[in-house]
Amino acid sequence: MRIRPWTPLSEQGSVGRPSFVADHELWDDDRLAAADRVEAELAHVDLVRLVFGDPHGLARSKTLTADAFRAVLRNGMNFSPGPFLFDTGHAVAVDFLGDDPGVGVDELVGAGNFVAVPDPLTFQILPDRAPRTAWVLADEYLRDGTPHPLSSRGVLRRVLAEYESRGLAPAVGLEVEWYLTRRLDDEPGNTGNGFGLQGQAPRVAAMNAGYQFNLDAQYDTIAPLTDPLALRLLELGLPLRSMEHESGPGQVETTFSPMTALDAADAMLLFRTVTKQFCAARGHHASFMSHPALDSADPSGWHLNQSVIERATGRNLFEAEGPSGSMSPEGKAYADSLLDWARDLFMLSVPTVNGYRRLAAHHTLAPTRIGWRVEDRSAMLRIVGTGAGAHIENRVGEPCANPYLNIAAQLFAGLQGLAGGAAGDAPAPGELLVPQSLRQSLEAFRAGRAAQLLGTPLTACLTKLKESEVSRYETWCAQNSSRPDRTTQWEQREYFGAY
């Protein structure tokens, strides 16, 4: 068979912006060295997924050929800003076609491109993929080379720079609950969907009856999926610690050993993405939606464990002498500051309408009050461990939260306490309850101090995204009858498939 010899022009000027990384000095020495190693690895790769986390914590990507990625590695790749502008249901929440999108980013006018620059330290070849595929995370930049003000990963990197300047390094551990279900059909869910309206949620069946917490026999019913998934996660280098069966039917908890904060956020994005892909390829559906509309579902949470290490000595700042659960003065200052900032930043830990169902009083193991206690799972902050293992577990998060923003919010708030920042007034008794709806949380976010962490543009953008989401939900509720104690059809369509 004769094959026409197509003659491509140079890729160097056809993707991204030539010499973008070098011209703007975007990489440190570690990344420059890693980029050379990545170029060598491309000989063993067919395709590369260039990925960034959107404001909702979902992985957005372009799949490039290995040859194209050689240029992208140092030029960056042009991306549409759409993922910054759509809410969870793909409704346009930021008016990018008007003269002023209203978030303070001029480059959004007309939906102009931004530049996604691969972080060569995150490059890895995915196991058992044909064609041979690599995954690499990107940092987002404006076209003039400045960090994109709507970048979630950029927010976390700024917070970590503050810790580094003080000789400190946060350590973060992940405990993530999610649902494993069996798909009943292969319908794509495109009936009646569009901008601002998600299609039908996946039709699924439960894996077991549930409600035998940690029962070994129940784990056996999910082990044909979770055991090979565990091996896949280990092949990816993730520091997996355990797979456990929780209370709900097919409800899984996956835990990881402590990591650096940026590694933890990157790991969470990769873990959720790979888990959904792995299960889908085997006729199952994994969902990180907190409270899916499944018979007898128990809501899922994301417990975020955190401590702070002094770089020079390796000392855990939270460590104190005394009985189990005691905390050092630094640890108490960190915890108190988390409480002081809790309402302002709560929406970053529980960002969906559905996530607040878990925080209702009748879910006894979910936190309902803003407070901290030693070894008490009803509190927002649970103080755990002693000595070098002393840490704070924040129990309010939902599993689908944006990992960069959730982790950044915790570390930023805690740092204000470590730095001796003035705390706000103690909450009045009626304010000790955690927010009970996304609307409540959004109003606290809108009126609060979030811009000190996020900057004005991202604060404005998230406000628009969440206002669009909650308004669509409220409109649906006004037009449809539903029980307030039940997950609605709107929530199931909005979150169960995508998350």
Residue ranges with predicted function:
Residues R2-L240, L433-Y499:
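ATP/Mg2+-dependent ligation/transfer catalytic cores
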Residues D23-E25, L32-E41, D46-E164, L168, ...:
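Active-site capping/gating regions of soluble enzymes
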Residues A171-Y179, L197-D216, L236-F256, A286-S307, ...:
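Core alpha/beta catalytic barrel or barrel-like domain that forms the active/cofactor pocket
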